[in-house]
């Protein structure tokens, strides 16, 4: 077997971009940044909030409207 082929597995800090929470875990990456953690996730907090990343819903609706308009004009 080859020696020293595996990456170093060390303690890293995970930072939440939403609430600022941080905790320590182990990984091969130097730092980990997450959008939502267990302190601010709607499932764990019991609060219903809309989590929309970069307007994906609006982008989908805009594309869907274009495709339905194209189909209507083709008929």
UniProtKB/Swiss-Prot annotation:
The keyword Cell cycle does not apply. InterPro entries: Ribosomal_bL28/bL31-like_sf, Ribosomal_bL31, Ribosomal_bL31_A, Ribosomal_bL31_sf. Keywords: Ribonucleoprotein, Ribosomal protein, RNA-binding, rRNA-binding. Pfam families: Ribosomal_L31. One of its GO terms (biological process) is translation. Disulfide bonds: none annotated. SUPFAM superfamilies: L28p-like (SSF143800). It comes from the Bacteria. Gene3D superfamilies: Ribosomal protein L31 (4.10.830.30). GO terms for molecular function: rRNA binding; structural constituent of ribosome. GO terms for cellular component: ribonucleoprotein complex; ribosome. Belongs to the bacterial ribosomal protein bL31 family. Type A subfamily. Part of the 50S ribosomal subunit. Binds the 23S rRNA. NCBIfam families: L31, PRK00019.1, PRK00528.1. This is Large ribosomal subunit protein bL31.
